[in-house]
Design a protein with these regions (language model features):
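Short, conserved phosphate-binding/catalytic loop or strand-edge motifs used
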Residues: 128-132
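DNA replication initiation on ssDNA origins
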Residues: 1-93, 99-102, 108
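A short linear hydrophobic-aromatic micro-motif
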Residues: 121-126
Length: 132
């Protein structure tokens, strides 16, 4: 089901959403989805106001790499492994709990978060993807 432009604009005009997206986008390549296709690569988000500007141009969602880059704009579709390894400065850890029972998934996610916090990780978040 496609999101209509009004729904996207109501969401992406929120300052808290704009700021959260830009904060999370730091040192990451951003993929901007326009309906059924993605925008140009590579791309980045730098300023909160860019989020609304892109939504006004038809952006329906924002996606980011798990990889952290020295400069995401240096990426190229023709870059080889050695070149990419030289540009990469780290990774986000993403754990995908793939279970058909949501209650089991919640228990598992809760235990993982508690463990990571016990290990003194500070930036831990959980996202439900809609069971897809």
């Amino acid at each position: 089901m496609a999101l209509d432009k009004g729904t996207c604009l109501r969401y992406y005009k929120r300052k808290d959403i704009q700021e959260a997206l830009v904060e999370h986008a730091g040192n990451k390549e951003i993929g901007i989805r326009y309906g059924d296709s993605f925008g140009k690569r590579p791309d980045i988000l730098t300023y909160p106001k860019e989020v609304l500007e892109l939504a006004l141009k038809g952006a329906t969602s924002f996606h980011c790499s798990e990889e952290l880059w020295d400069n995401p704009l240096d990426l190229s579709g023709t870059s080889g492994k050695k070149e990419l390894d030289g540009l990469r400065k780290g990774w986000d850890l993403v754990l995908d709990i793939d279970c058909k029972f949501i209650d089991y998934s919640k228990i598992c996610a809760d235990l993982i978060v508690k463990f990571l916090k016990k290990c003194e990780l500070k930036d831990v978040s959980v996202k439900f993807s809609g069971n897809k």
